[in-house]
Amino acid sequence: MSELITLSTQYAKNFLDEAAVRERAGAYAHLIDEARAGFLNDWDSAGWMRLFEHTNEASIRRMEEKAAEIRREADAFILIGVGGSNNAARSVIEALVPDRTVEILYAGNTTAPSAIERLLRRMEGKSVFIDIIAKNFETLEPGAAFRVLRRYLYETYGTDAARRIMATGTPDSRLHRLCRENGWDFFTFPETVGGRYSAFTEVGLMPMAVMGVDIRALLGGAERMQRHILGAAAEENPALLYAAARTLLYERGYRAEMLTFFEPRLAWFSKWWIQLFGESEGKDGRGLLPLSCECSEELHSMGQFLQQGSETVLETFLCTAEDSDGPALRPDGLDDGFAYLDGKHFADLNAAALGASMRAHSGHLPCLQLCTGACSEETFGALFQFFMLACVFSCRMAGVNPFDQPGVEAYKRSMFRALGKEG
């Protein structure tokens, strides 16, 4: 299947023995059994493994119906959330929906005054609907933005504002109570799913549906990838092999992982990936610092460091198949010095830049290569599920909890004290 992912260590052979990677994966074969069982020891955090427990046919139909209503009536749809509450949706929307009948705007991801003021100006004269996503409805950024935006809606639309507001939170939370009291539509943020693992719940799917993403195809890609990983032997399992390679390189002194991609549509996906691994793996003084590099643009900046900088970075190339060759480069009679490009397409240029980068960088640092299909709903579904499973496997190998974030909670407590919040 084109959306499945393959791992190659060809460009890491000077730093990493493939047999050692397979041996390490084999030593952790029990992690596949744990995954098949739905990570029983973390049942209250691994709801994302039970794909259709929270996202069944009735849930999908309800999301599709609400999304169709918003597309009929809205000029602008505002997604209020931060981090795991919006990264998955944003990565798919920005990649797959370039032409939009409804403008999507983002709020609740910054405390900068300029951002909320700019957003309010962009809303003027438009028919606006909003979705506030907050699992426990205590995070500062979405809470503050929601207060400003709901006031705007009620001042602009009066009683009609209620149907323009939907909220995604945990059942019986404060946000759920506000929905019942004010007539806002409520969607579920499952208790058993953390924000960074929430792509396949109403958290991620509802905004995608509003923007016209085929959420059924996305779920299909995730289901196929999950079935593939849970059915593969340890020594042939791409997620377990990727986790094993990362772990071995960490043990050999590498301290950062650069996700490099030559498809600009993956830019927001890389932000999701950074949060997934940073928040899951970075604790107890351990973990690879997750970074990203968008090419070929950043070959002219980070490429220098990757080829001749400090030897602490491993590079993972995420390669998607091209869905188009792009325009052909044809001569126009001018002696511009680029005659060697005559007859070539942009896909040829991209492939050449990718290959040259892997060859050049692999002389200085280990380069892993992950290959998948062209950008599509199925591919993104597969990518989300692949990396979530690989992340859990990596954390298990490192001996850290993939589902908590004590450092984030500590910063929040300090901020709340500074703002005068009691308790």
Where are the regions that the model predicts?
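C-terminal amphipathic alpha-helical interaction region
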Residues: 400-423
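Hydrophobic alpha-helical scaffolding
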Residues: 56, 106-109, 135, 139, ...
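Acidic catalytic cores of enzymes that act on phosphate-bearing nucleotides/polynucleotides
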Residues: 52, 213-216, 229-356
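Glycine-rich phosphate/diphosphate-binding loops that line cofactor/substrate pockets in enzymes
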Residues: 42-43, 62-75, 118-128, 245-255, ...
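Glycine-rich phosphate-binding loops that contact phosphosugars or nucleotide phosphates
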Residues: 68-232, 413
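Extended, charge-enriched "interface" segments that sit outside catalytic cores
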Residues: 1-68, 332-340
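Short helix-loop-beta junction
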Residues: 94-103, 152, 276-287, 360-364
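Flexible loop/turn segments at secondary-structure boundaries
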Residues: 85-88, 113-115, 138-141, 173-176, ...
